[in-house]
UniProtKB/Swiss-Prot annotation:
Pfam families: V-set. The lineage of its organism: Eukaryota, Metazoa, Chordata, Craniata, Vertebrata. Residues 42-50 are annotated as: Complementarity-determining-1. Residues 1-19 form the signal peptide. Residues 20-41 are annotated as: Framework-1. One of its GO terms (molecular function) is antigen binding. This is Immunoglobulin lambda variable 3-25. InterPro entries: Ig-like_dom (IPR007110), Ig-like_dom_sf (IPR036179), Ig-like_fold (IPR013783), Ig_sub (IPR003599), Ig_V-set (IPR013106), IgV_Light_Chain (IPR050150). It comes from Homo sapiens. It is found in: Secreted; Cell membrane. SUPFAM superfamilies: Immunoglobulin. V region of the variable domain of immunoglobulin light chains that participates in the antigen recognition. Immunoglobulins, also known as antibodies, are membrane-bound or secreted glycoproteins produced by B lymphocytes. In the recognition phase of humoral immunity, the membrane-bound immunoglobulins serve as receptors which, upon binding of a specific antigen, trigger the clonal expansion and differentiation of B lymphocytes into immunoglobulins-secreting plasma cells. Residues 51-67 are annotated as: Framework-2. It comes from the Eukaryota. GO terms for biological process: adaptive immune response; immune response.
Amino acid sequence: MAWIPLLLPLLTLCTGSEASYELTQPPSVSVSPGQTARITCSGDALPKQYAYWYQQKPGQAPVLVIYKDSERPSGIPERFSGSSSGTTVTLTISGVQAEDEADYYCQSADSS
């Protein structure tokens, strides 16, 4: 049974000229194909800001997979979903497929 590593680097995000926020993700998550992967991102600003999730594969540009905490762009499979609770947001990939192996980044942005 193969394991799919989902690599999750720490991302520090500056949102505007006067403020910067640190978002923390776990170093990595590995799951077997068909399992559910839950990737968390924590930061003090998250209750006041929307979270955005990006998938990036080697040699490719990042792809937005979730915006405004839980909205899924057109063309993104339904197995990708997002949720938010307090200072933590979660990207869930249900029924992980081999093609989901990638880096996943969270970003925050003002909700106004």
